[in-house]
Regions:
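Conserved, structured core segments of small domains
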Residues: 1-111
């Protein structure tokens, strides 16, 4: 393994798919400010985050958060503090590890 490969970081990704329907859309809007306040309060622990969109490029249908941790329990703790999680707007939440091989989080290329 080269020196750059040692810079690869393990992060935790949360892919959160919204429930379908007007009620879920309204819940998203109702809790948006609380969600924004929450992610702002943990911004130093987030590599990137944002809404996911349907194929039309306009309809929000979920959220993705990439946490700067290699501990799923820690990422789940941050996620459970999110008003969207607490309001149960997500139909499903998938949590996975990602080892970052390139990008500004690891100084460019790691090979």
């Amino acid at each position: 393994m080269n020196d750059k490969a040692e810079n690869r970081k393990m992060f935790v990704v949360a892919y959160c798919k919204d429930k379908v329907g007007e009620e879920a859309t309204q819940e998203r809007h109702t809790h948006m400010q609380g969600h924004m306040d929450h992610v702002a309060s943990i911004v130093d622990h987030i590599a990137l985050a944002g809404p996911m969109y349907a194929d039309d490029g306009e309809t929000i249908n979920g959220s993705m958060l990439v946490y700067k941790t290699d501990k799923i329990d820690q990422a789940c703790e941050w996620l459970k503090g999110d008003p969207y999680y607490q309001a149960n707007i997500w139909e499903s939440v998938e949590i996975k590890f990602i080892k970052v091989a390139l990008g500004d989080q690891v100084g460019g290329l790691t090979w």
